[in-house]
């Protein structure tokens, strides 16, 4: 049975393999396509915004594009994007055999998290790729992903939260570091459904992390944290732009440095309690 499950996982990996993104690259960075707006996106360092951004442009030899031009300028190997700004659009033209390609490009200084797969209430196989503005090469991983949440995970929600578990090529858990956060295989994508600015939850948590008192056992576990670290990212799911999310660590035993129950000596070394519903008991505790 294990062998059969492994073969099925390999088959899924072949179908949903780590994507090769680009028809072209900009300063070695992959561009990501959003089919909803017919726009390519690329993540570059924030200090490039408000400046003329000089970039080397390279076509992917396997993509079939030729005769690339940007804003009417034929591209040999480089181009200067004038006064880069958020949401500023640059017109792109190219040939793909006999087909004319007319599309557009825009820049962001937020990391781009690309997910591929068909996800729902239960875990399903897929993959993720994280493109940081500070790194030319993406971080790639197989993953299993599902929708996350209670009241935020109902049929009327237009923007889903996600739970991501990173896997290796054998379908086993694989701990990786994303955007400088802890190495783990357990990640949360928070949609900020009632946070119209998509930033308040993240900023509030960062403020908490700045002034929160260390756990009482900090002398024994100096790396214990009482708040999670997270980063703001833009998410593209199956070539469709899904908006701004907060990619965070999980608040768990690992974050709090809690030791498991000692069966031998029958000792508790710490417990983590989580609210599962907003019932009367919960409100009584919080009042």
Language-model regions, residue ranges each:
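Phosphate-handling architecture centered on phosphoinositide signaling
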Residues: 25-57, 63-65, 72-287
């Amino acid at each position: 049975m294990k062998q059969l499950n492994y073969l099925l996982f390999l088959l899924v990996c072949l179908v949903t393999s780590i994507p090769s993104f680009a028809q072209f690259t900009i300063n070695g960075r992959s561009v990501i396509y959003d089919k909803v707006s017919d726009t390519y996106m690329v993540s570059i360092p924030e200090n490039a915004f408000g400046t003329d951004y000089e970039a080397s442009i390279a076509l992917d030899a396997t993509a079939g594009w030729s005769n690339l031009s940007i804003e009417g300028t034929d591209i040999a190997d480089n181009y200067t994007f004038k006064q880069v700004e958020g949401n500023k659009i640059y017109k792109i033209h190219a040939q793909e055999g006999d087909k004319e390609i007319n599309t557009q490009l825009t820049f962001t200084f937020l990391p781009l998290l690309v997910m591929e797969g068909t996800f729902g209430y239960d875990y399903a196989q897929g993959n993720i790729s994280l493109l940081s503005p500070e790194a030319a090469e993406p971080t790639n991983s197989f993953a299993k992903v599902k929708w996350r949440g209670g009241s935020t995970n109902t049929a009327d929600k237009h923007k889903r939260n996600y739970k991501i578990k990173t896997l290796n090529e054998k379908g086993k858990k694989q701990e990786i570091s994303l955007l400088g956060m802890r190495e783990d295989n357990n990640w949360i994508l928070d949609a900020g459904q009632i946070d119209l600015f998509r930033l308040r939850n993240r900023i509030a948590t960062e403020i908490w992390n700045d002034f929160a008192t260390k756990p009482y056992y900090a002398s024994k576990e100096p790396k214990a944290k009482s708040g999670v670290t997270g980063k703001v990212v833009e998410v593209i799911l199956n070539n469709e732009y899904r908006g701004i999310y907060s990619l965070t660590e999980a608040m768990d035993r690992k974050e709090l440095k809690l030791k498991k129950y000692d069966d031998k000596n029958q000792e508790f070394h710490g417990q983590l309690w989580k609210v599962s519903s907003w019932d009367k008991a919960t409100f009584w505790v919080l009042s």
